[in-house]
Regions:
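N-terminal metal-binding scaffold of metallo-dependent hydrolase/deaminase domains
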Residues: 1-36, 369
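Conserved, mostly hydrophobic/aromatic
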Residues: 57, 126, 182, 212, ...
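Active-site core of metal-dependent hydrolases
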Residues: 153, 157-279
Length: 371
């Protein structure tokens, strides 16, 4: 494939009249006025070309949930690619060890035999079971346990190698030492669903934690005398901050605060999507609980927010609406999420990178996925 006349996001800026030669699913050449013997030549006529989005926190999409196993993850892979996503971390939630292992088995199966035309599964994000009962949010807290090696083995069932990230409450007994154990194994530890104070957040970072799960949601709040999780995260340069830019989970000013404090390299746009994402309002499920979606907001019967219906397309557009430049919004939805979980292959347009792109009009309306 030869892509012509793109306004491509390269090396942190948009470069017009860019051509890309694609061979065997990878970017083989980047330049201007490229020529090649190709059956498939796509002239973008100045449209914007982003690397495919990377979503490191997504539970479900278009009616299928990670917890339902392999076929659900395959469905997510296929459908997410249509929405401009190149790679993602299927995200588990609080459940029994048996159900958690089933979900991880499904993720592993898709990693071992990927969908031919789907977004790449980079690994699993485990959002449980080492969480704080007082900050459960929509997570069933009856399955929360202490972070011990025995519990880790019960909940992973031999699937540790495919776990890319885990959300933990660092104030739990034994958590700091276990953070060290996990990070030494190459797993990104994210602080979330937590009642930790600022000092505990910094201590967790000392032990290797470098990520915050859906910043400001399901954690201690920001206060001028007790800065809590978000206050510590804003000033700790070791920590990347996930945030849900749907205008529901966070006020736009809070999104602006995160972007201003963390910058485009440490502000990680996520969807935290549940199965209603890409679907109309109605009644859905999350972790066996009824979720009611009205005007795009997903809530349990008691009003608790239960994931989002956000897509990465809308996240990118909202970031610009909330004050980010197109370059900043592109970075926060592509390379920054990828790097936050140790991946430097996705989220960039460079020679050798996977050739999956999100095409937008010059006004940043989504057109199609290319690749």
């Amino acid at each position: 494939m030869l892509i012509k006349n793109a306004k491509a996001f390269l090396n942190g800026s948009f470069q017009e009249n860019t051509d890309l030669l694609i061979k065997d699913g990878k970017i083989a050449e980047i330049g201007t006025a490229l020529t090649a013997e190709c059956e498939n030549v796509v002239d973008l006529k100045g449209d914007v070309l982003l690397p495919g989005f990377v979503d490191v926190h997504i539970h479900a999409f278009m009616g299928k949930d990670t917890m339902n196993g392999e076929e659900a993850v395959r469905h997510m892979s296929r459908e997410l690619k249509k929405f401009g996503v190149a790679a993602f971390l299927p995200t588990t939630m609080s459940a029994s060890p048996e159900d958690t292992c089933k979900a991880l088995d499904g993720i592993r199966a898709v990693m071992e035999a990927p969908e031919a035309d789907g977004a790449t599964v980079l690994g699993a994000h485990m959002e449980a079971p080492f969480l704080n009962e007082g900050k459960a949010g929509a997570q069933p807290k009856q399955f929360f346990v202490l972070p011990t090696e025995e519990n880790w083995q019960r909940y992973t069932g031999g699937n540790e190698p495919i776990v890319r990230m885990i959300t933990m409450a660092p104030e739990k007994e034994g958590a700091l030492d276990f953070i060290t154990r996990l990070t030494n194994s190459g797993i990104t530890v994210s602080i979330g669903h937590t009642g930790a104070d600022a000092e505990t957040v910094h201590a967790a970072a000392d032990h290797g934690a470098n990520h915050i799960t859906h910043t400001f949601n399901a954690q201690t709040p920001l206060n001028h005398r007790s800065p809590g999780v978000p206050g510590a995260a804003m000033v700790d340069e070791r920590i990347a901050c996930e945030f849900i830019s749907d205008g529901i989970h966070l006020h736009p000013d809070i999104c602006r605060l995160i972007m201003r404090c963390k910058g485009k390299e440490l502000a990680v746009a996520i969807t935290d999507a549940m199965e209603a994402a890409g679907m109309p309002d109605g009644k859905y499920q999350l972790g066996g609980q009824d979720v009611f979606v009205k005007e795009g907001a997903a809530r349990l019967e008691d009003g608790t927010l239960a994931g989002s219906t956000l897509t990465m397309i809308r996240a990118f557009q909202n970031l610009m609406k909330f004050g980010a430049t197109p370059e900043e919004a592109a970075t926060m939805t592509t390379s920054t999420p990828a790097k936050s979980v140790g991946n430097h292959e996705y989220g960039v347009i460079k020679i050798g990178a996977p050739a999956v792109f999100a095409r937008f009009t010059p006004e940043y309306e989504f057109v199609e996925t290319i690749g």
